[in-house]
């Protein structure tokens, strides 16, 4: 800055605080406010300077501007900065918060104001970043006094509406992220996730991920070092799924925000806007396409478990359909005793659901295993 050139160093900052303390109204709190305040090296520099000012009675709080983007910073860095600052001051303000829809961040005055339509992928990334940030801020609620957004709507933002940075859109209507910020679930903030994860029973042979734990959380791992974003369609909170984060080795990992409903779930990956199946999971036909599948442990899973009992057969048959003028396929379950005598059995026809196909009842629904178990227990007559 010009002041640094005049003074030859940053000592002008202390003079500013001295004059402010001397001439400001009594009781006025003095804050040091800066951008990129989460970066470890800069966090240390701010900490060291604030420590000297605190020892001289010149500072009351620290302001973190909060000009972030959908890709960063990591909430681990923000959490570490808040933790470090809170050892010096008891008042921290988030002073200029916005999360833009590109890779730029910080308080620089040169930035991109133009852009196309905001994709649903980017909206999901922004919602996740806001949710993660406010979870960290709530963790430090004893020292974070307030959060100030850097204007009301995208129309008014210094970044421009195309950067989509604020909770209100350019027409002053609240985005979904507004509700995510406001209607958080305190129970999730304090939830303790058990680290008893094990591979899903529906994984490809030899694959460790995805994983599930005894509480119903799901954890995912995707190796895509050159990707900019990876989203799993399975998740909670109406945020479009679970956003994975890349570690230092270029591996994307993430855990669902909370326990999933028990039983079978379809899901897919969205990598940089493209839709893919998870290479670690088996595929199942649903939603009119082959999707990845995961099984969340259920309290009644014994009902459809593979047991050491006599098993029937599931046979594939083809037939000609006059109504559709096509050859069709069906699967027929026959009980373990079928064919051993001349006994005739009643027929029950099951139609698959919308978007699924004839494999669903046995693959996803385990109908054949349910029948095997009920017959073995004498609870049903084949």
Predicted feature descriptions by range:
Residues 14-43, 93-96, 146-152:
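Aromatic-lined carbohydrate-recognition surfaces of secreted/lumenal glycan-active proteins
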Residues 211, 219-262, 272-296:
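Aromatic-rich carbohydrate-binding modules that target alpha-glucans
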Residues 10-19, 36-52, 75-82, 132-133, ...:
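Alpha-helical scaffolding within the catalytic cores
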Residues 2-10, 19, 77-93, 97-188:
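Aromatic-rich peripheral "rim/lid" segments of glycoside hydrolase catalytic domains that contact
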Residues 189-221:
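Extracellular ectodomain segments of secreted/surface proteins
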Residues 28, 32-34, 47-75, 79-111:
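Aromatic- and acid-rich polysaccharide-binding/catalytic face
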Residues 211-214, 218-221, 245-246, 287-341:
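N-terminal cap/lid segment of alpha/beta-hydrolase-fold proteins
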Residues 338-382:
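Short substrate-entry loop that stabilizes the transition state in hydrolases
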